[in-house]
Curated annotation (Swiss-Prot):
Cofactor(s) the protein requires to work: a divalent metal cation
Subunit architecture: Homodimer.
SUPFAM superfamilies named in the record: 2-isopropylmalate synthase LeuA, allosteric (dimerisation) domain (SSF110921), Aldolase (SSF51569)
Name of protein: 2-isopropylmalate synthase B
Binding-site list for a divalent metal cation: 80, 277, 313
Species this chain originates from: Solanum pennellii (Tomato)
CDD domains: DRE_TIM_IPMS
Function as written in the Swiss-Prot or TrEMBL entry: Catalyzes the condensation of the acetyl group of acetyl-CoA with 3-methyl-2-oxobutanoate (2-oxoisovalerate) to form 3-carboxy-3-hydroxy-4-methylpentanoate (2-isopropylmalate).
InterPro entries found in the cross-reference section: 2-IPM_HCS-like, 2-isopropylmalate_synth_dimer, AIPM/Hcit_synth_CS, Aldolase_TIM, LeuA/HCS_post-cat, LeuA_allosteric_dom_sf, LeuA_bact_synth, PYR_CT
Taxon lineage: Eukaryota, Viridiplantae, Streptophyta, Embryophyta, Tracheophyta
Family listed: Belongs to the alpha-IPM synthase/homocitrate synthase family. LeuA type 1 subfamily.
A GO cellular component annotation in the UniProt record: chloroplast
One of the record's GO molecular function terms: metal ion binding
Gene behind this protein: IPMSB
């Protein structure tokens, strides 16, 4: 059997050793080694650093993975992630995120919950048709998955949406913990087992060959009951068994043991893929996910930036980079097919679209993740980067400097704008490209240098806006310490008519928001307001995020509890003027809320949401 070993030049000890464990894989190129030399600045010797490129993704079969070390990444950003308060996405935004997930190379995209609303149904269908039939490298095509409760209506809706993809999947679930069965479902164990078995069989009977089943709240379920119900759904045709720690209750050792015991005690488990879905209520979602993988799970459910219900989900970037960084050494050789150089761009896209800011000290993608301020650390970094960096920032798509030498400025042309945005992960053309370019030119007239972060902020503000009901034309404010601030706002409605209003307030932003309210005449409550400087300097672009809640209507029904939830809507704005940035964000949130109201009125159907 072939093997590859790289030794340390001084100690002679192995740095990396690779020996294929599966004889069927000996003819495939899984590693492409690229030795490079990293030198100490004040030393006379060099240390060879061996890096490897992305491994080949094994051919997809629903219930089997040819390479036992390969781990599938299931991205549920568009389903569970969107359930974060204020993270409501438009159909176009969901499509853009799905495209970016495909660039990442995720194996499965859970595109939504089609039965929750007609809007979600159409969004999942659009993603299935476009992203699920895309042309990618090495014959890769992502699986497109739709969530469904264990009932025929939900399953029919899910199949209606995902069947257009080359690789469609239905993900159905029912609760299995005593507290859920007794108080929420009001069903006996036998009834729950029969419902799960019959609905998995029904999903297979309508033509779906890839069916995932989740026993909701598995982390608090009786293990013996889990083995039984999982065995029954395997017999009914399930291809993936997802084990959700729905309330983030377990600790890593406990969750790893649960996965191991399921593999050891569930009849027929050798014919399916075991999956994990870990919530972050105790801050253990990444650790639990890795523990599950070490115990035998070969599908990991994650979200970009870890967004999701309550405290969020296991973070895609953390899980993937942990496997990349420690997979060979301590995680049994586990690896994924993720192109990690798209991680940072994916994070920024989801941050901009969802309006959920990434905390500066967030692992992997936070603003401080690769920043060194301590004098001792800085000294070490100057001598050798490996002293305080276990991950190269370039591995996630973060370039320390503009290596191309191309600087964006007011003299740059539109022909440079398109490839630059493509480099940043955005495919835009036509009117969207023109609008972005002229917005960029406007900023470039006032700002000497336009950074990548500036472009991303302008992209989010100009392109990732909901279908406009109202459009900001002008805003003029007067403020100071001598009296109330005043604001005059001009908005354009969908028919092109101008509306002007004036108001006073305790500050320029408050006055401007009150002027907008006088025009729109829709009562809302401002729940959150935040502003960040995109870059450094007095000429930095200000990025604003607001979260609002409508006073009338705008509710959704929780699919599991039946509870009425007051839906919130976020809006983002970007401009060098903080008042204009603030008003853009507020108008964007209002547009999203009013578009949602029109859609619900058109379909005359309440929306549902689901948690697993």
């Amino acid at each position: 059997m072939a093997s590859i070993t790289a030794n340390h030049p001084i100690s002679g000890k192995p740095l990396i050793s690779f020996r294929p464990k599966n004889p069927l894989l000996q003819t495939q190129t899984l590693f492409n080694f690229k030795p490079s030399i990293s030198k100490h600045s004040n030393s006379s010797f060099s240390i060879p650093v061996v890096r490897c490129s992305i491994r080949r993704i094994p051919e997809y079969t629903p219930s089997h993975i040819p390479d036992p070390n390969y781990v599938r990444i299931f991205d549920t950003t568009l389903r569970d992630g969107e359930q974060s308060p204020g993270a409501t996405m438009t159909t176009k935004e969901k499509l853009d995120v799905a495209r970016q997930s495909a660039k990442l190379g995720v194996d499965i995209i859970e595109a939504g919950f089609p039965a929750s609303s007609e809007a979600d149904l159409e969004a999942v269908k659009l993603i299935a048709k476009e992203v699920g039939n895309g042309v990618y490298e090495e014959e890769y095509v992502p699986v497109i998955c739709g969530l469904a409760r264990c009932n025929k209506k939900d399953i029919d809706k899910a199949w209606e949406a995902v069947k257009y993809a080359k690789k469609p999947r239905i993900h159905t679930f029912i609760a299995t913990s005593e507290v859920h069965m007794n108080y929420k479902l009001k069903m006996s164990r036998d009834q729950v087992v029969e419902k799960a078995r019959s609905m998995v069989a029904y999903a297979r009977s309508i033509g779906c060959e890839d069916v995932e089943f989740s026993p909701e709240d598995a982390g608090r379920s009786d293990p013996e009951f889990l083995y039984h119900i999982l065995g029954e759904v395997i017999k009914a045709g399930a291809t993936t068994l997802n084990i959700p720690d729905t309330v983030g209750y377990t600790v890593p050792e406990e969750f790893g043991q649960l996965i191991a015991k399921i593999k050891a005690n569930t009849p027929g488990v050798e014919d399916v893929i075991i999956s994990t879905h870990c919530q972050n209520d105790l801050g253990l979602s990444t650790a639990n996910t890795l523990a599950g993988a070490c115990a035998g799970a070969r599908q990991l459910e994650v979200t970009i930036n870890g967004i999701g219900e309550r405290a969020g989900n296991a973070s895609l970037e953390e899980v993937v980079m942990a496997l990349k960084c420690r997979g060979e050494q301590v995680l049994g050789g586990l690896y994924t097919g993720i192109n990690t150089q798209h991680i940072l761009m994916s994070s920024k896209m989801v941050e901009g679209i969802s309006g959920l800011h990434v905390q500066p000290h967030k692992a992997i993608v936070g603003a401080n993740a690769f920043v060194h301020e301590s004098g001792i650390h800085q000294d070490g970094m100057l001598k050798h980067k490996d002293t305080y960096e276990i991950i190269s920032p370039e591995d996630i798509g973060l370039n320390r400097a503009n290596e191309s030498g191309i600087v964006f400025g007011k003299l740059s042309g539109v022909m440079l704008c398109k490839p630059k945005m493509l480099e940043l992960g955005y495919e835009i053309e036509g009117k969207e490209l023109d609008d972005l370019f002229w917005r960029f030119k406007s900023v470039a007239e006032k700002k000497k240098k336009i950074t990548d972060d500036d472009l991303v902020a302008l992209m989010s503000d100009e392109v990732f806006q909901p279908q406009f009901v109202w459009q900001l034309q002008n805003v003029q404010v007067t403020c100071g310490s001598l009296g109330l601030s005043t604001a005059t706002v001009k908005l354009i409605d969908a028919d092109g008519r101008e509306h002007i209003s004036c108001s006073v307030g305790t500050g320029p932003v408050d006055a401007a928001y009150k002027a907008v309210d006088l025009i729109v005449k829709v009562p809302v409550t401002l729940l959150e307001y935040s502003m960040n400087a995109v870059t450094q300097g007095i000429d930095a672009i200000a990025s604003t995020r607001v979260l609002i809640r409508g006073e009338n209507g705008h509710t959704s029904t929780h699919a599991l509890t039946g509870e009425t939830v007051h839906r919130t809507f976020s809006g983002t704005g970007a401009d060098m003027d903080i008042v204009i940035s603030s008003v853009r964000a507020y108008v964007g949130a209002l547009n999203k809320m009013m578009s949602f109201r029109k859609l619900m009125a058109k379909n005359n159907k309440p929306e549902s949401s689901a948690v697993i």
